[in-house]
Amino acid sequence: MKKRIAVLTGAGVSAESGLGTYRDNGGLWDSYDPMEVASIQGWYRDPGKVLDFYNMQRAKLALTKPNAAHCMIAELEKDCIIDVITQNVDNLHEKAGSTHVVHLHGEVTKVRPQNSCNEEDGFSEKYVFDVGYEEVHLGDKAVNGSQLRPHIVFFGEAVPKMETAIGLVEKADIVLIVGTSLQVYPAASLYRYARPDAPIYIVDPAEVPLFDNRIRHIRKVATEGVEEFVAMLK
């Protein structure tokens, strides 16, 4: 029977593709105030500024390719059931060939209505659509006439895919965490839902507090650490 692996990824897995991290020294939040460009308050205060920020992110992503870590994770699907749970809003896992990716914080290549289409549906997936790498501007309207906004979970908003992610971790035989400092909640608590018999591997070059004796820390960058993990599976 194929092993089921839940792969939780953060900004570190895309850093080697040239996409900046957020919280590290020199990261995006050193240049931009997240409360201005990535919070629900910032959106209502100055939506044009938020749209410009994500237009810039989309343009950069258009020129960015997945790295070996993304590709090795996708390759694991040949022998294992792989559930990728990513904190990243890029599409590099999909570009690499991963077929089951849960985006906890949304996707930069997608948009949805600013206002709910109705009280029951909220931002139902049927109202979310892919704009690829195109720009979105003030005045671009959704089908219900409201302003289009990035399909991003802003600071100050709930994480709607969290329950889905928890369910995937609970079913996993192995949990692999790549490129996240486990500082961003609620995602940082996901590994705690792993089964008692499920080993947990963390790939991160920085020191990581180990809260569980099942955790093995592979202290390497994503490409090198995922390669080591894959070798251990063989």
Identify the role of each PLM range.
Residues 1-234:
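Conserved catalytic core of sirtuin-type NAD+-dependent deacylases
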